[in-house]
Regions:
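Conserved acidic segment of CheY-like receiver
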Residues: 2-24, 35
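A short, hydrophobic beta-strand element within the central beta-sheet of small alpha/beta folds
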Residues: 78-88
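Walker A (P-loop) phosphate-binding motif
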Residues: 129-146
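C-terminal output helix
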Residues: 109-117
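The C-terminal output helix
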Residues: 120-131
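Short hydrophobic/Thr-rich beta-strand motif most characteristic of the beta2 strand and flanking loop
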Residues: 29-37
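Conserved phosphotransfer microenvironments
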Residues: 42, 52-72
Length: 146
């Protein structure tokens, strides 16, 4: 059985959001929880909804999106962050990955690339199962003889 992947999307425009929403809707493993174009609003939704993944588009204001990725990587380490953008300059991709994004998705979305990213995200989320805390005592015994 495949785990359901939940997504929150930060888009730079309505066209980008519609494209991402349509591509995600084509995969049965995915459920879109929320989307928006305001970084603070999306940040609050991320904390409230705790999705398994987030797609953050890098547009004209890429610095704000990269700062959001850094912030989410620190505060939501179990969430797989995916950056996306039309501009696929190596510098921008590298900066987003260094900030904490796990993958970069080129826009417009190509079906095979999206499937690969969703497979990686699914593997990442499956490995995030919290281990139960073991309770016990540690007793150390030292010999009184040298």
């Amino acid at each position: 059985m495949t785990n359901l992947l939940t997504f929150v999307v930060l888009s730079t425009g309505l066209d980008n959001f519609k494209e991402i929403r349509t591509a995600l809707a084509a995969d049965s493993r995915v459920r879109l929880l929320a989307g928006g174009n305001d970084a603070e609003q999306v940040y609050e939704e991320m904390l409230r909804l705790k999705p398994s993944s987030a797609i953050i588009t890098l547009g004209a204001n890429a610095e704000q999106a990269i700062m959001l990725i850094k912030r989410l990587a620190l505060e939501c380490p179990a969430t797989a962050l995916i950056s996306a953008g039309h501009e696929t300059s190596p510098d921008l991709i590298l900066r987003s990955l260094r900030a904490g994004a796990r993958d970069f998705l080129r826009l417009p979305i190509i079906g095979d690339e999206l499937k690969t990213v969703l497979d990686r995200t699914s593997e990442f989320c499956a490995g995030q199962v919290a281990a139960p805390k073991k309770r016990g005592k540690m007793i150390a015994v030292f010999s009184s003889k040298g």
